[in-house]
Structure formats: structure tokens, C-alpha cells
């Protein structure tokens, strides 16, 4: 798993880890049943606290991206194409909701927001 985090990114470390793993699952970079590194190993590799990785793993499990078997570790969940599409849409909506909300607080109209999104895309 090729994952990196930046302490100065403005996004909590656990969320950066969550996003990286979720993205890898959705894009097929991580296969169903594939083992994730143990929490301590991932923390060492990413140079973050065990708590940050544990929090990310718990959120990923809660959202159905991974499963954890006591004593065996955490593994990528078996997800159908439809389930992956739903998870992808949910993550996009979550991120866009935050951004659109901020733009609205600046007084931007729907048309202005759509124009900016189109420019960025």
C-alpha cells in the first residue's frame, strides 16, 4: 500500500489515512481479502501515532471498507461494484458538502460554485 500523510495538510492524520485506504479500495489498488499492515507497522511506516492509525482503521471498519479479525488483523472487505460505487458517491458528497458549504458562506451562487468546480476539473 502506497500511502503518505502530511502533518501540515490541515486535515487530521487519521482522516488522511482513512482517505488513502478508502481511495485504494475504491480504485482497486487494494484487493478484497488483502491484509492491511498491523496498526503498529503502519504507524511506524507513516511516522504517525498508533492512535491515528487505530482511529482510521476503526472508521474504515465502521464504513465497511475493511474487516478486522481478532488475532488475525485487518483485511479489505469484499465489496460488489455497486457497493463500491455507493461508497465512492458518499465520499464525494461528503467532501463536496464541506466545500460547497464554505463557498456558500462566502456568498457564492450555485453558478459561481459550478464554474469553479468546472475550472478545477
Question: Model regions: which residues?
Answer:
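Short, mixed-charge, low-aromatic patches
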Residues: 10-16, 50-59, 70-76
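Short, cationic-aromatic polyanion-contact patches
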Residues: 14, 38, 72-88
Amino acid at each position: 500500500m502506497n500511502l503518505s500523510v502530511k502533518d501540515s495538510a490541515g486535515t487530521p492524520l487519521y482522516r488522511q489515512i482513512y482517505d488513502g485506504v478508502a481511495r485504494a479500495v475504491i480504485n482497486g489498488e487494494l484487493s478484497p481479502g488483502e491484509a492491511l499492515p498491523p496498526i503498529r507497522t503502519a504507524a511506524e511506516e507513516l511516522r504517525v501515532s498508533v492512535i491515528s492509525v487505530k482511529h482510521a482503521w476503526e472508521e474504515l471498519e465502521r464504513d465497511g471498507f475493511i474487516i478486522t479479525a481478532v488475532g488475525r488483523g485487518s483485511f479489505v472487505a469484499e465489496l460488489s461494484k455497486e457497493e463500491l460505487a455507493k461508497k465512492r458517491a458518499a465520499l464525494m458528497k461528503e467532501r463536496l458538502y464541506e466545500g460547497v458549504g464554505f463557498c456558500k458562506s462566502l456568498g457564492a451562487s450555485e453558478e459561481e460554485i459550478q464554474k469553479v468546480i468546472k475550472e478545477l476539473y
